[in-house]
């Protein structure tokens, strides 16, 4: 079975399903949905995976993101905060939040256990925990694979799921997360087609259009494994754009199959690079009118 991870795998899943492949599944998941489900102890290593990830949020906003009832937090002042409205403005403030994880450890671990149980129910329903398979993700840093393997370890799952990525960027985070992992990339990674990486990095938003979905990101798994999405109603323009991408690929598939067309990654991304760097006047206007999807 090939599992296409939300939201990056939405387009490819629709195309594979349209082509009649039976062994494909769309996996509703996200980094947020897996992060808490992985945690069994509140040690330094685990706390490093938890928010806050950047300054600017209030203490209360971080707790809301984690679905923690503020009324159950009893050590706010001991951690160095005066109110839930206090803004985390510095690295020191972010470190202070870790004290809250320690002081109110059981409150956080209870939420982690609940999210793990609900995630377990969802993944059992997909069959992923019961059989080997392959997962597709757009990639860049390998976070989903790293989290999925952590979750599988937490629930005692031994099935194997190597990943296939569009590309993996070279960086400390990706090298750390993918160390010892089994994966393949199509476009580039640490060792393959390295010269393409700089060009992609400068225009990553355009490429990510191909790996988006009309639904919101998964927030967490509710009781019984129900999928809870982040607030939002989707975007009709995004839906229209994704349908156009899918239709274009479907129409071209018969030609590619009939004439056994093969191409290299470098040649494949050439037209998009031309569109980005040397658009015609008409194309430039059309791109300029695109909303950020």
Residue ranges and their predicted role:
Residues 1-293:
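Long, low-complexity, Lys/Arg-enriched
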């Amino acid at each position: 079975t090939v599992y296409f991870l939300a939201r990056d795998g939405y387009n490819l899943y629709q195309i594979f399903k349209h082509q009649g492949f039976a062994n494909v599944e769309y996996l509703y998941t996200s980094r947020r949905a897996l992060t808490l489900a992985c945690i069994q102890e509140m040690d330094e290593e685990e706390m490093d995976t938890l928010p806050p990830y950047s300054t600017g949020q209030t203490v209360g906003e971080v707790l809301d993101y984690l679905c923690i009832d503020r009324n159950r937090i009893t050590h706010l002042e001991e951690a160095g905060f005066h109110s839930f409205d206090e803004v985390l403005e510095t690295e020191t403030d972010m470190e202070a939040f870790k004290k809250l994880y320690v002081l109110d450890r059981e409150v956080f671990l209870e939420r982690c256990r609940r999210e793990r149980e609900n995630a377990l129910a969802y993944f059992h329903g997909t069959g992923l925990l019961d059989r080997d398979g392959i997962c597709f993700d757009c990639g860049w840093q390998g976070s989903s694979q790293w989290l999925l393997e952590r979750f599988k370890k937490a629930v005692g799952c031994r099935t194997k799921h190597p990943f296939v990525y569009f590309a993996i960027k070279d960086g400390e985070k990706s090298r750390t997360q993918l160390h010892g992992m089994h994966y393949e990339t199509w476009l580039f990674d640490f060792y393959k087609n390295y010269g393409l990486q700089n060009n992609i990095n400068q225009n990553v938003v355009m490429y990510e259009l191909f790996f988006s979905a009309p639904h919101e990101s998964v927030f967490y798994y509710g009781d019984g494994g129900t999928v809870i999405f982040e607030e939002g109603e989707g975007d009709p323009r995004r839906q229209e754009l994704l349908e156009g991408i899918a239709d274009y690929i479907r129409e071209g598939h018969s030609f590619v199959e009939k004439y056994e067309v093969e191409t290299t990654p470098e040649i494949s991304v050439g037209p998009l690079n031309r569109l980005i760097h040397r658009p015609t006047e008409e194309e430039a206007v059309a791109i300029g009118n695109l909303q950020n999807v």
